[in-house]
Design a protein with these regions (language model features):
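Gram-negative outer-membrane beta-barrel transporters
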Residues: 336-338, 343, 396-399, 403, ...
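C-terminal beta-signal and adjacent terminal beta-strands/loops
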Residues: 549, 601, 623-682
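Membrane-embedded beta-barrel scaffold of Gram-negative outer-membrane proteins
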Residues: 188, 285-288, 292-308, 441, ...
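Short acidic/polar hinge/loop motifs at secondary-structure boundaries
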Residues: 115-145, 164, 479
């Protein structure tokens, strides 16, 4: 680990580093022109989108937005929340459409064509760690919600997004950020011509001790190298990215420990928690005549020390454990979109296939004391291969009516080699998923949508093979590897074509099995079938040249199916999420942004007897640009509210306690944080 960190550190020190949230990205080599605003949310989607909840975010939407952590990039998606229940190097906690998505169980991310979510992961199924992304290099984010889109497969029942990085930068820059608690972030990036193409690079280093009583001691290194140009007359994009991080964690803590004065809100019980992780990836995107080819390879490692229950299961040594995951990921996709006719009806035909192979050499769980392993609970290896194929036909039935018929097929084959022989074995699974969408244009400003589709998420494939519980030695029943879901949506989109748009979507979503967080195991497990229905509203208004306003709200009702009323609530699922922002942006001058994010209270038990409180956070950012320099100031949690990012209800046992105690375990939101940003354009 030290060798990898050192290599990236050397790369960073050979260039001038610094930080700010502003992004500049016009094509290199173009003549200098006056900077203009490009708001992704103002892009015209009438006649293009297939659902009311589909959208695009990018450009100035990102560059003017103060964020506390990388994962908050996805909060540009209406109704999406990213929080944290442990250390800064771990994947975040996500919420959307009444889901507690844990670390990404039903929401997928693709980064320059590469899937981000990890399946059959040591910590959580669908683990979506975005810490390897450099926010300033994300040009555009395309998102969609619901299982209505044939080109998207696993972990996409609630939604998905595809992030695209810049091909080139208008100007290189170096940035420096200084924050409280010894926070320093360096970033430098530039692009230049190489032969007939353009080479872009970026190097980042971030370190902080955080505001918790236990120093987080974060050391993160990021790098990216991207070539855009022709390779043998084939338009290509080749990207190499490298990420390496170590950190110390303060996990969620029991409410009783704070109320008794044992610790304060930012205190800790176990000082040994934390982890390390790396991800090295190579992606290629190629335009082959009528076909688009995408290839990717990734090497990944994570070691995570956790202890949610303290002394519950082992009063002598404690419950601390390590989860370890090491793997190689290989895969790709091939797609083709053409305009044709069927019986004289104009049709857009989109067909494609994708393949993914995970070779997991370390899939381990150990009991630990002081981060030292003393007992192996599981040591597994896994191979998981999936092949998907899809097709959809968009019929332009009239000048106003579009109908899209789609179908997707997914096949999974997997093999587990376990330390306990009874848990070794292999199997396969497959499923078909039909999709249908209608779009009707009332006029040039107003479009109606209706959607239906089936989708799925995969389970950790060990649950399809296991016959013995490795922790207790008791018999264990196997479960399906692939879990179906179905959903429908109706809505509309209104766009003045002059800087104002407005969407409303009414949705329903049924799952055959919910992925649930299990506190005393520190992981996710398949649960009961569920149903959700809700409504979403999103609006963007470019009031005038420098001033823009956005607003979104989502209200969802969710419950487990098959249980009586009063015993069927879904824990940790927020039914109301709202966000709004006001941005004033003058090129070569002042930029000011004020954003508010709210999520409602949530029940923590199926009988609704225990709840967590709501959260409302206000972020503020201001910067001034003059010639080659820019100075900025971000104030996160402006009102310094004592809200909670996350809370759970489960049993734990402190060192001084003789019995287990059921309690709320919470992780506080960040204190007010002030960051000073300095940028120099190269």
């Amino acid at each position: 680990m030290n060798c990898r960190c050192g290599l990236l550190a050397v790369l960073i020190t050979v260039v001038t580093p610094a930080f700010t949230p502003t992004i500049f990205a016009q094509e290199q080599g173009e003549p200098e022109i006056e900077e203009i605003h490009v708001w992704g949310r103002s892009l015209q989607l009438l006649g293009i989108a297939n659902s009311a909840s589909q959208g695009v975010v990018g450009y100035d939407d990102f560059s003017t937005r103060p964020i506390a952590r990388v994962a908050e990039l996805v909060e540009v998606i209406p109704g999406m929340i990213a929080t944290q229940h442990s250390g800064p190097g771990k994947a975040n906690q996500y919420f959307l459409r009444g889901f507690n998505l844990d670390h990404g169980s039903d929401f997928s991310t693709y980064f320059d064509g590469m899937p981000v979510n990890w399946r059959t992961h040591a910590h959580a199924q669908g683990y979506m760690d975005l810490n390897f992304i450099i926010p300033e290099l994300v040009e555009r984010l395309d998102f969609q919600k619901g299982p209505y889109f044939a080109d998207t497969g696993d972990f996409s029942l609630a939604g998905s997004n595809r992030m695209k990085t810049y091909d080139s930068l208008e100007e290189g820059f170096s940035e420096l950020t200084l924050g409280l608690e010894e926070e320093i972030r360096f970033l430098t990036a530039d692009s230049f011509e190489v032969g007939d193409g353009i080479l872009l690079y970026a190097l980042e280093h971030h370190q902080t001790n955080g505001f918790f009583d236990l120093d987080q001691d974060v050391r993160k290194y990021n790098g990216i190298l991207k070539y855009t140009g022709d390779i043998g007359n084939i338009p290509s994009r080749i990207t190499f990215s490298a990420y390496d991080s170590v950190w110390v964690s303060t996990n969620q803590v029991p409410e009783r420990a704070v109320q008794s004065g044992l610790i304060d809100r930012f205190g800790f019980i176990d000082p040994d928690l934390g982890g390390e992780s790396y991800r090295y990836s190579l992606t290629g995107m190629f335009e082959l005549s009528d076909w688009d080819l995408n290839l990717y390879a990734s090497s990944y490692y994570m070691s995570l020390i956790n202890n949610p229950t303290y002394m519950l299961n082992n009063p002598i040594n404690g419950d601390e454990f390590e989860q370890e995951d090491e793997r190689i990921l290989l895969g790709g996709s091939l797609s083709n979109e053409v305009e044709t006719e069927i019986f004289g009806i104009p049709v857009t035909r989109n067909i494609g296939t994708d393949m993914r192979y995970d070779n997991v050499s370390e899939l381990n769980l150990f009991n630990t004391v002081g981060r030292k392993r003393f007992k192996s609970l599981r040591e597994d290896e896994a191979e998981e291969l999936s092949i998907g194929a899809f097709a959809d036909l968009e019929f332009s039935l009239t000048d106003q009516l579009r109908a899209t018929l789609g179908v997707r097929f997914d096949y999974y084959d997997f093999e587990i080699e376990a330390l306990r022989p009874g848990n070794s074995g292999g199997d396969n699974d497959s499923l078909w998923q039909p999709k249908v969408s209608l779009a009707y244009s009332l006029n040039e400003n107003f479009e109606l949508y209706a959607n239906y589709g089936q989708g799925f998420h995969s389970n950790d494939v060990r649950v399809a093979v296991n016959t013995i519980d490795p922790a207790t030695g008791d018999p264990s029943a196997s479960m399906d590897a692939l879990v179906k879901g179905k959903g429908n949506e109706i809505g509309f989109r209104y766009d003045t074509l002059e800087g104002f748009n407005f969407t409303i979507a009414r949705f329903e979503l049924d799952l055959d099995s919910e992925l649930m967080f299990v506190g005393d195991a520190g992981t996710t497990e398949p649960g009961l079938p569920s149903r959700r229905d809700g409504i979403e509203l999103a609006s963007f208004w470019e009031i005038n040249e420098p001033l823009a306003f956005d607003f979104s709200v989502s209200k969802t009702d969710g419950h487990f199916r098959g249980l009586p009323s009063g015993e069927n609530a879904i824990p940790d699922a927020h039914d109301l999420v709202a966000a709004a922002g006001l941005t004033y942006h003058v090129p070569n001058g002042w930029t000011t942004s004020l954003r508010v994010r709210h999520f409602s209270d949530a029940v923590l038990t199926e009988d609704e007897s225990v709840k967590k409180s709501s959260s409302t956070l206000l972020h503020f950012g201001v910067s001034y640009e003059q010639d080659s320099w820019e100075l900025g100031l971000d104030v996160l949690n402006l009102l310094d509210r004592e809200d909670d990012d996350i809370a759970y209800w489960f049993e734990s046992r402190l060192l001084s306690e003789g019995v287990a105690v059921e309690d709320v375990h919470f992780h506080p939101s960040n204190q007010r944080a002030v960051r000073l940003l300095l940028k120099y354009k190269l």
